[in-house]
C-alpha cells in the first residue's frame, strides 16, 4: 500500500467500446480496484478508487496526465483521502508500467479473445479475469506467489508489531 497506479483503457464490444479503470498495487501487482463503464468520465475513476479504498489506501497514487486524473473532482478526492498524487511525465507511459503491463495481459488474454455483447457481459468477464489474476496466477517476480498472497499479508504488517 505504499504506491498504487491507476489508468483507463478501452475495451471493444460488439457495438462500440467500454472503458476500464484499474488500480494496481506496485509491490504485489494486485488489482485492488476496478470499474467498467460506457462513459469515459471522472465518476468512473472515483468509483474504482472507492472500491479499492474500502480495503486500504496507498501513500502515493500514480497516474498519467489524462483529463480524468487532472480534474478538480479527482484531485480533491485523492487529497481528501490523505493520499499524495503523482503523475507521469508527459508521454512517458513507462512511468506507469505496472498498470500498463496488466492492461496488456488483460487485453491479450481476455478482451481481444472475446467480443462482449454488452456491459453486463464484459463486467462479469473482467471480474473473473481479475479474480484469477489476483488469486490463482503466480508471478516469477513475486517468488511464484500470487498477487493476493503478497498483498493481503503485507497489509497486516503495521498491525503485527
Positions of predicted regions on the chain:
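Charged DNA-binding/catalytic regions of mobile-element recombinases
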Residues: 1-161
Amino acid at each position: 500500500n505504499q504506491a498504487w497506479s491507476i489508468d483507463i483503457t478501452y475495451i471493444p464490444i460488439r457495438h462500440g467500446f467500454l472503458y476500464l479503470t484499474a488500480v494496481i498495487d506496485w509491490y504485489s501487482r494486485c488489482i485492488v480496484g476496478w470499474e467498467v463503464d460506457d462513459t469515459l468520465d471522472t465518476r468512473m475513476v472515483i468509483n474504482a478508487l472507492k472500491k479499492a479504498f474500502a480495503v486500504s489506501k496507498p501513500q502515493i497514487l500514480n497516474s498519467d496526465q489524462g483529463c480524468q486524473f487532472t480534474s478538480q473532482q479527482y484531485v480533491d478526492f485523492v487529497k481528501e483521502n490523505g493520499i499524495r498524487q503523482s503523475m507521469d511525465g508527459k508521454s512517458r507511459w513507462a512511468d506507469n508500467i505496472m498498470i500498463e503491463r496488466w492492461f496488456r495481459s488483460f487485453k491479450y488474454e481476455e478482451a481481444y479473445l472475446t467480443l462482449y455483447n454488452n456491459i453486463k457481459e464484459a463486467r462479469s468477464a473482467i471480474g473473473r479475469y481479475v479474480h484469477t489474476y489476483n488469486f490463482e496466477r503466480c508471478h516469477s517476480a513475486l517468488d511464484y506467489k500470487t498477487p493476493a498472497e503478497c498483498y493481503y499479508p503485507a497489509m497486516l504488517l503495521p498491525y503485527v508489531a
